């Protein structure tokens, strides 16, 4: 199932401490988050391994979830242990061998001033089957992308290190613009005109067998898959420059480009703005790191056992 296929509307979702049927997991139309985008979320994958279903880097995702709530003074009234057990149980109840997991916290229904006031913080966890985000073929052949006319907001405007629901309007605009023009995904630039990231992915550039990825000061989300790729690359002897500025023009002259993300995993980029990148397909460095990533998450290696939470 790709990102653009319909989800099956059945199963169980955890909401505010209760397990409810999928069709009953609803919110009030006057919820604060519905009007002002005041929610935070995570996207996490669980993989079907020989040792059972395993959530990848759950603890790091939980860290970011709670940290994302802080700029919005959002109090999450459930402990890490409660959210972990809720997530494991949702996966069990939905009988999922592999899954995409979506923890969500948002200001709910009470009042509709811009200030959330006494609005409650509602919390939910859903999980469903979700295959390659941009399609299985994209993992092998790469995707066509377009640099968007929409710019990424700066951290001086809205906290870019928080995974905030409302901020993804920017991502939606960029992605849909690219798809209208025949591309499969977008790249957004920051306010200085340097490369930031994809709508839901971090980006890596390969040049002379070295890796470059925009630093946190470039208005990017501190991606957990980004960190995974950096670790895997350094373990394989690659030099990684993870705090750089990348110009738009550098994209076109790269040896290789690829996206990373919990949904996108490791997806090669074969073309930017109708300009072929490298050999026009998945480059050798990208292929090596992609293979290492999938070997890791599917537990075909014993490396980094600490990154897995078993259902």
Language model regions located:
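Helix-start/capping segments and mature chain N-termini
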Residues: 1-78, 85-89, 112-311
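Short, acidic/charged, Gly/Pro-enriched secondary-structure junctions
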Residues: 83-98, 104-110, 128
């Amino acid at each position: 199932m790709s990102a653009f296929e319909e989800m099956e509307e059945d199963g169980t979702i955890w909401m505010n401490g209760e397990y409810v049927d999928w069709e009953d997991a609803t919110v009030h139309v006057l919820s604060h988050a519905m009007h002002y985008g005041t929610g935070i979320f995570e996207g996490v994958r669980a993989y079907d391994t020989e040792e059972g279903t395993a959530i990848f880097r759950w603890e790091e995702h939980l860290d970011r979830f709670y940290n994302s709530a802080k700029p919005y003074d959002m109090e999450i009234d459930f402990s890490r242990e409660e959210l972990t057990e809720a997530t494991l149980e949702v996966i069990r109840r939905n009988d999922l061998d592999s899954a995409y997991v979506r923890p969500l916290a948002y200001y709910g229904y009470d009042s509709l001033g811009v200030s959330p006031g006494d609005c409650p913080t509602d919390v939910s966890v859903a999980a469903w089957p979700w295959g390659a985000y941009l399609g299985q073929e994209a993992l092998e052949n790469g995707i066509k992308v377009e640099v968007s006319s929409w710019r990424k907001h700066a951290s001086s405007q809205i906290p870019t290190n928080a995974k905030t629901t409302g901020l993804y309007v920017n991502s939606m605009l960029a992605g849909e613009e690219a798809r209208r023009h025949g591309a499969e995904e977008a790249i957004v630039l920051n306010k200085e005109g340097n490369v930031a990231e994809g709508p839901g992915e971090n980006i890596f550039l390969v040049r002379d067998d070295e890796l470059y990825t925009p630093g946190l000061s470039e208005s990017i989300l501190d991606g957990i898959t980004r960190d995974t790729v950096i670790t895997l690359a350094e373990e394989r002897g690659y030099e990684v420059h993870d705090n750089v500025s990348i110009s738009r023009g550098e994209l076109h002259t790269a040896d290789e480009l690829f996206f990373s993300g919990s949904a996108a995993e490791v997806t090669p980029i074969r073309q930017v703005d109708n300009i072929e990148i490298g050999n026009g397909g998945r480059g050798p460095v990208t292929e090596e790191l992609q293979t290492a990533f999938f070997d890791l998450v599917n537990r075909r290696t014993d490396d980094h056992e600490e990154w897995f939470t078993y259902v």
